[in-house]
């Protein structure tokens, strides 16, 4: 899946961090030799090869000696793989000797890639290709009692574990739409690596609004008023009107209830005889029109009437394709007869808003139907025989004529005005995964984010598309957002968290927040919300929940106290920390210090017993804190009291043997404490503090071995709780490494989780550390050179251990032969005149580096002078 710019650099040792994972690798030179002298820390166990036929498995024994951290881990045998994968592996092995780019996969991702290497038939037990989505978001229509309130809600289909019935539920949107704002400027962040927050956010009604005899294939909300919900199964289509009613009209902030009234019923046996429904699409501006598609390719446009509905237009995909091929130039496309009549293909139809027509597609062709007195059929796209079309998305596009295509090979950015001419193509290199899907989020007219995710393993990569001077560009590297690799995904929606600077919330404002909210419906039946951060930031953000009528329901605050300990600064810290309107109060070390170190007898001192007695009193002032997770120090020292005087909390912590915070938060390396004050300035040196040995300044007769393991664990729990609260995490149970992954997920835990969580510690070699120090997910860091300290290199071209580098590519502008023209609504050209003969130009592929003075453009030629 790697598309780093180094893929196109020849004769240079390189490495690919697939899926954007933070991992380690053993660097190799083009000859296949290890660059570093010590390779015992090599954690990469499997290699794969990206060729013109896709992602293939490489026979490791012929080229590389791969070591594993786990001595019991066994490499798979090629004979255990399907025959097709084995053949492609041998081809890749035989052709890989002349290549210099080697790719490796970490051991904790091997099982994921092994799934991608299987044939499509082996994935049928994991996913159902006929199910388009299992939940959707939409706005409810104001009722007569509540005319001025619109509320976003979620519709979700579930299968009952007891009765195996297919149920449809509704849920209010709160609290899964978040917005982010910077609360402090020019301050260091605590978490310097990407993180996400798990939030328990869904409360469904006990009773479903409908029961289906067959699994729900698609859920769609209409855009206009009234708000309609289309629920489609293989045999029936039910259309609901969804409203939200307040329980008490005089109190707008009181809870309300969702209601769904079925308006229309369509049965596949009535409209398509023995055929079944494939998908449904609602007109983007007029709710009275919608279209359906059958599994055999028949598509029909319907219109609502007061007494029912009527059929406006209908045809079959085969007839539409034949008319489109007749109108297309014969030299512009070459196709096979089996593509005209494919077996076991899936048909889809959807509205497009630019011309008010319909887009049809199967696995090989994409058509456009211009509706009028005489419908026009045009061919938009045709893929090669070894590529299949998986999905077409045109919703939420800022320019209505544009859409995205997901194929088994790449993601294509298309424009209806330019058939067969993609604006941009990005190869995802996941050809062997038939479960890929995309979701498109357009923040504003210049930024479009396409998320490609796998239903088999849950790995998500996000691609950023934009335009620079009307030319399509993509300057961001795909990065990992979610990584529940062990649980397949049924549906996924990713939304940005917007910035707000005032009480008014404008979705059309500029988008520069690194936060995203993702709703995931997993195969195990769970529905969860994740707040994700794509990269580290120098700002501190305040995440606020948005509801339909109210403002804030919860806050996640990150607080960095000032280094200055003056009274004025302390007062500022108190003001920042105080959040009286928040449901979740934040417990910070700075406020704890001011409470504990009260000026008694004009001495800023406190004994350990006083500290123990003050902690429970301070904790009880906060209703949101779970008292069960707090073990007070007074209970710990009842049988073993300590006498001592401490000037600040830092000294108390320094007297506690290693808290192992690095185990709980792998990326939280340290907090600096000043001798005169506990205020910390950075998170880069916590290791020097938490690994400090116990040095008793109190009673020399006290011996540390007297402490029992349970007492040490309780002390750690208290300190962990203080640190968790100081970085903006509250209302959680202390993470217990003895808990299983399932138990951890079931707890109400708000914490920073590293990608691909692994309880085993990883020891990184020198080359690996050099890579990871300057690398972030979602961002190609500045140009850096990683060399071998044991080898001196003067001439990279002649040296066996040449320098390894990655060139920064923030934005590469790839010109198109024909710039997309955006027409105004008043001056829309004739549709048929826009279709011209396809050009044979090479599609710009962003995984390639464009070199040369003029990039991919030809060099400028001097004009010939005419005249005398």
UniProtKB/Swiss-Prot annotation:
Concerning InterPro entries, the annotation shows: RNA_pol_I-sp_TIF_RRN6-like (IPR019350), RRN6_beta-prop (IPR048535), RRN6_HB (IPR048537), Rrn6_K-rich (IPR048536)
User: Its Gene Ontology molecular function terms?
Assistant: RNA polymerase I general transcription initiation factor activity; RNA polymerase I general transcription initiation factor binding; RNA polymerase I transcription regulatory region sequence-specific DNA binding
Q: Which organism is it from?
A: Schizosaccharomyces pombe (strain 972 / ATCC 24843) (Fission yeast)
* Key word Transcription regulation present: no
A Pfam family it matches: Rrn6_HB
An example of a Gene Ontology cellular component annotation for this protein is: RNA polymerase I core factor complex
Localization, UniProt: Cytoplasm; Nucleus
Main location group: cytoplasm
What is this protein's name? Answer: Uncharacterized protein C3B8.11
The entry's keywords: Cytoplasm, Nucleus
Query: Which BP terms from GO are recorded?
Result: nucleolar large rRNA transcription by RNA polymerase I; transcription initiation at RNA polymerase I promoter
The keyword Nucleus belongs to this UniProt entry's keyword annotation = yes
């Amino acid at each position: 899946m790697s598309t780093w710019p180094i893929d196109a650099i020849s004769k240079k040792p390189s490495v690919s961090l697939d899926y954007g994972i933070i991992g380690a690798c053993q660097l190799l030179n083009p000859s296949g030799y290890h660059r570093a002298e010590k390779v015992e820390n090599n954690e990469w166990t499997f290699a794969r090869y990206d060729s013109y036929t896709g992602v293939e498995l490489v026979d490791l024994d012929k080229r590389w000696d791969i070591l594993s951290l786990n001595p019991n881990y066994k490499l798979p045998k090629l004979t255990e793989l399907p025959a097709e994968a084995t053949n492609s592996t041998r081809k890749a092995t035989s052709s890989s000797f002349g290549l210099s780019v080697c790719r490796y996969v970490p051991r904790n991702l091997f099982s994921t890639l092994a799934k991608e290497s299987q044939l499509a038939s082996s994935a049928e037990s994991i996913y159902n290709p006929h199910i388009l989505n299992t939940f959707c978001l939409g706005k409810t229509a104001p009722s007569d009692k509540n005319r001025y309130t619109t509320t976003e809600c979620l519709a979700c289909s579930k299968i009952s574990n007891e009765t195996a019935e297919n149920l449809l539920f509704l849920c209010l949107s709160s609290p899964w739409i978040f917005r982010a704002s910077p609360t402090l400027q020019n301050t260091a962040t605590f978490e310097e690596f990407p993180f996400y927050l798990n939030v328990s956010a869904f409360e469904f009604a006990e009773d479903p609004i409908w029961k289906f005899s067959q699994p729900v294939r698609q859920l769609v909300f209409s855009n206009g008023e009234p708000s309609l919900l289309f629920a489609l199964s293989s045999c029936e289509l039910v259309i609901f009107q969804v409203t939200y009613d307040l329980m008490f009209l005089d109190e707008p902030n009181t809870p309300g209830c969702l209601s769904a009234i079925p308006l229309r019923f369509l049965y596949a046996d009535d409209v398509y005889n023995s055929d079944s429904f494939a998908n449904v699409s609602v007109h983007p501006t007029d709710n009275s029109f919608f279209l359906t598609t059958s599994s055999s390719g028949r598509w029909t446009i319907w219109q609502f009437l007061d007494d029912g509905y009527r059929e406006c237009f209908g045809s079959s995909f085969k007839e539409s394709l034949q008319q489109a091929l007749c109108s297309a130039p014969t030299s512009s496309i070459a196709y096979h007869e089996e593509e005209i009549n494919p077996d076991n293909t899936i048909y889809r139809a959807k509205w497009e808003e630019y011309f008010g027509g319909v887009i049809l597609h199967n696995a090989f062709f994409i058509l456009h139907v211009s509706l009028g007195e005489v419908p026009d059929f045009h061919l938009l796209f045709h893929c090669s025989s070894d590529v299949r079309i998986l999905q077409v998305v045109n919703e939420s596009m800022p320019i209505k004529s544009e859409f995205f295509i997901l194929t088994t090979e790449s993601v294509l950015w298309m424009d209806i005005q330019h058939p067969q001419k993609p604006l941009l193509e990005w190869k995802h290199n996941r050809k062997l995964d038939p479960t890929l899907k995309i979701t498109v989020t357009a923040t504003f007219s210049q930024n479009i984010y396409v998320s490609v995710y796998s239903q088999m393993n849950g790995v998500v990569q996000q691609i950023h598309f934009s335009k620079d001077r009307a030319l399509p560009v993509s300057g961001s590297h795909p990065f990992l957002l979610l990584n529940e690799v062990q649980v397949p995904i049924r549906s996924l929606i990713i939304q940005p968290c917007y910035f707000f600077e005032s009480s008014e919330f404008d979705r059309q404002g500029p988008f520069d927040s690194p936060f995203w909210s993702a709703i995931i419906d997993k195969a195990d039946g769970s529905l969860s919300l994740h707040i994700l951060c794509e990269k580290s930031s120098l700002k501190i953000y305040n995440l606020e929940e948005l509801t339909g009528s109210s403002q804030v329901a919860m806050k996640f605050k990150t607080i960095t106290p000032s280094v200055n300990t003056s009274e004025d600064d302390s007062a500022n810290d108190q003001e920042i920390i105080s959040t009286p309107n928040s449901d979740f109060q934040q417990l910070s070390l700075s406020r704890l210090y001011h409470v504990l170190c009260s000026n008694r007898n004009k001495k800023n001192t406190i004994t350990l017993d006083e500290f123990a007695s003050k902690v429970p009193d301070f904790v009880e002032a906060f209703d949101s804190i779970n008292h069960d997770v707090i073990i007070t120090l007074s209970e710990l020292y009842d049988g073993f009291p300590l006498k001592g005087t401490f000037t600040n909390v830092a000294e108390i912590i320094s007297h506690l043997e290693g808290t192992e915070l690095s185990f709980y938060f792998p990326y939280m390396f340290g907090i600096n404490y000043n001798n005169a004050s506990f205020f910390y300035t950075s998170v880069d040196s916590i290791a020097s503090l938490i690994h400090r040995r116990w040095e008793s300044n109190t009673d020399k007769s006290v011996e540390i071995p007297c402490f029992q393991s349970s007492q040490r664990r309780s002390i750690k729990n208290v300190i962990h709780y203080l640190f968790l609260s100081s970085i903006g995490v509250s209302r959680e149970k202390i993470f217990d490494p003895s808990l299983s992954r399932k138990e951890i997920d079931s707890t109400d835990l708000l914490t920073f989780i590293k990608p691909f969580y692994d309880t085993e510690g990883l020891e990184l070699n020198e080359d690996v550390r050099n890579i990871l120090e300057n690398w972030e997910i979602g961002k190609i860091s500045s140009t850096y050179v990683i060399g071998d300290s044991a080898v001196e290199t003067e001439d990279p071209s002649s040296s066996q251990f040449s320098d390894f580098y990655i060139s920064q590519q923030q934005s590469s502008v790839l010109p198109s032969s024909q710039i997309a023209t955006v027409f105004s609504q008043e001056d829309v050209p004739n549709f048929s005149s826009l279709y011209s003969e396809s050009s044979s130009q090479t599609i710009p592929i962003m995984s390639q580096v464009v070199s040369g003075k003029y990039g991919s453009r030809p060099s400028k030629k001097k004009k010939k002078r005419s005249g005398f």
